Each structure stands twice: as structure tokens, then as C-alpha cells.
Amino acid sequence: MSLVEKNTASEDAFALSEATARDYLVLLKPRVMSLVVFTGLVGLVLAPGHMNPVLAVISILCIAVGAGASGALNMWYDADIDAVMKRTRKRPIPAGIIAPNQVLAFGLTLSAFSVMTLGLMVNWLAAALLAFTIFFYAVIYTMWLKRSTPQNIVIGGAAGAFPPMIGWAAATGEITWDSLVLFMIIFLWTPPHFWALSLFTTNDYEAARIPMMPNVKGELSTRRQALFYAVLMAPVGVLPWVMGFAGMFYGVVSTLLGLAFVYYAWRLWAADSQLQMLAAARKLFRFSLLYLAGIFAVLLFEALTFKLLAAFGVF
């Protein structure tokens, strides 16, 4: 059975209701999109030189649309497991609001539009990175890794790490070591973030037969690996300051937040009861969001401040 047949064969089973603009917005996974747009914006602003403001806005919009397209394609393919999991069963396809083939067409149209617009209006390197990101998330992660290996988040996390590289490439037309460091921060952040989530949503993933780390390797192994990636991530998070494309303020904030991240991961690893483990997993999950938002916010603040002062001739 082809991929299209997989999700259209049972389409008659959906008692479709009239879809609204809000329902199509849900397909774009707006929460995920907001993080993608934010990190892409940081990459664009942090990049050296000055970019035409109109092209900058176009770049960010294309990154947002591309991210939304990935989300729609993910929901199209994952409609069967979304119907099983508590936190996803109200999404438009399992809820019977939008037909699978309409979601597929929506996702493919947005994908083509975002990539072609970015290429024609900005540059083709950024467009190629955006196209690869959409492909990696929708095909490599969603259709293959997610259902086949407990390392799905580790490898698949690359999809969420590309946006700052896309923003950087849009501004400079280049891939540099600096942009690769931004990629690595998010790449190493992803496993402990999602494994913390999976530790207190294990039943959901098990019901959907998704091989998340706790379901396959057990909770102790998951906690150990979350700590391992946190320890790897913390020093990488300081590299923007070490390499000279972030300031001292960022260096201090990233160091403190990195140490706190390791502490929360250690608390999770050291938990000696199920109740303590679940509490520690929730704390790590919440703090991981604060960590990523915090360090990228500081990067953005420093970059905007420096460019504003430079515009007034201070530097």
C-alpha cells in the first residue's frame, strides 16, 4: 500500500465537519512553529552584516510556512497514532474535521510555496536547507525513525535544529561554524527535552506503539541518557561566547543555565522512587523550555543591541 493509500483508504470512516481557519492553523503546529521561527530569527539577526528588512521578513515567513508544512505532513501520516494518543486525538484528522487527502495537499502546497519563495526572493542555499528540513522531518523522522527506533528523537532532532542555520544562510548565503554551533545546541538539547516528556507520557506512546526510549530501554536507561546529553549540551551552549559571536552577558547566562540544566537532569537520574522520578521529569521538561528560550533570547538581545549601536556609530 502506498503512502497516499495508507491515509486515504480509511477516509470514509471520518464523519467530516466543516473546517475553519483555526482547524488549518492547528495543522501547522503553532507552538512548534513559534519555536522554529524564534530560533530562525536569532540565526538571521546574529549573522554578520546587514540584511534588507523586507528580505528578512520574507525569510522568516518562509521558515514559518515551511515549519507549518512539516507539521501538516506529520499529522497526515500520523493520523492513525494521533487517534490513539490522548494528547493528539483532538487533532483535525482524528477528530473528523479535515480529510487526510486535504491535509496532504495542504502540506505539500505550503512546502513548495515556502521553498520556492525563499529561493527566488532570498537565496537558494537557504531554500535548499529549508527543503531538506521539511523532507527530514516529514519523511526521515515521521515516516521512518519515529516508528522504528528508540533513537528517533536523537536523529530526528536534527530537523528542529536547522532553523537557525536557515536564518543564517538567508542573511549571508553561507554555512559557517557559528551557525553549526547553533545547530548543535538545539540538536543536543532535543533528547533530554523529549525524553523527560516521554517519561511522564509513557502510556500514551505505548498505546500508539511508538518505540520511545522509556518503553524500549526502560526508565533508568532513559534517565541516564538524558543526563549524558545534558552534560554534552551545557559546554556547547557556551561556545557562541567562546567563539566570539556572543558577548560576556551571554557567556554568564549560558553557563548558569547550562549548569542548572545538568542539575535537573542529575535530579532525574538520581530519583529513587517513581513519584520522585515523575516529578523530576516534569521539572526537567519545563526547565528545558526555559533554557532554550533563555539562551536564544540573550543571543537575540545582544545581536540587536550591537547592531543598533553600530547603526548610531558607537562601534
Swiss-Prot record:
PANTHER family, per database record: 4-HYDROXYBENZOATE SOLANESYLTRANSFERASE, PROTOHEME IX FARNESYLTRANSFERASE, MITOCHONDRIAL
Pathway named in the protein's UniProt entry: Porphyrin-containing compound metabolism; heme O biosynthesis; heme O from protoheme: step 1/1
Name of the protein this chain belongs to: Protoheme IX farnesyltransferase
Organism: Brucella suis (strain ATCC 23445 / NCTC 10510)
Any single Gene Ontology cellular-component annotation: plasma membrane
UniProt cross-references to Gene3D superfamilies, sorted A to Z: UbiA prenyltransferase
Presence of the UniProt keyword S-adenosyl-L-methionine in the record: no
TM annotation in the entry: 32-52, 53-73, 93-113, 120-140, 153-173, 180-200, 226-246, 249-269, 295-315
Family: Belongs to the UbiA prenyltransferase family. Protoheme IX farnesyltransferase subfamily.
Entry membrane topology: Multi-pass membrane protein
One of the GO biological process terms: heme O biosynthetic process
Keywords in alphabetical order: Cell inner membrane, Cell membrane, Heme biosynthesis, Membrane, Transferase, Transmembrane, Transmembrane helix
EC number: 2.5.1.141
Protein's job: Converts heme B (protoheme IX) to heme O by substitution of the vinyl group on carbon 2 of heme B porphyrin ring with a hydroxyethyl farnesyl side group.
UniProt cross-references to PROSITE patterns, sorted A to Z: UBIA
